[in-house]
């Protein structure tokens, strides 16, 4: 559900950006990577009324986590520059997954062209 909701926000933002461009209204979607927050420690604040949670392993990402203040700077600059996508990771996941996804889409379009001529 989590990944599907993120994909929905991205898709909705793309369509909204396209539809509002004629009115000179920009829409940006933040696609953050690891941010230096206490999200992995949030379990200690979980109310007991929510019941027990599932065990999970906390990833060691402290060395690559971005400072929230730096994220805020990037977001503000991205909005000012009317960027459609605002990323916080210029390497790794972002630079590998996006080209892989585009390649799969192009392959499927090529397949379709072969079917319909």
Regions of interest found by a model, annotated:
Residues 13, 24, 108-111:
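Enrichment for repetitive, rod-forming helical segments
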Residues 5:
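Active-site helix of classical SDR
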Residues 105-117:
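Non-catalytic terminal and boundary segments that flank Rossmann-like NAD(P)-dependent oxidoreductase
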Residues 2, 10:
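Catalytic tyrosine of NAD(P)H-dependent dehydrogenase/reductases that use a Tyr as the general acid/base
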Residues 18, 22-90:
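SDR active-site lid
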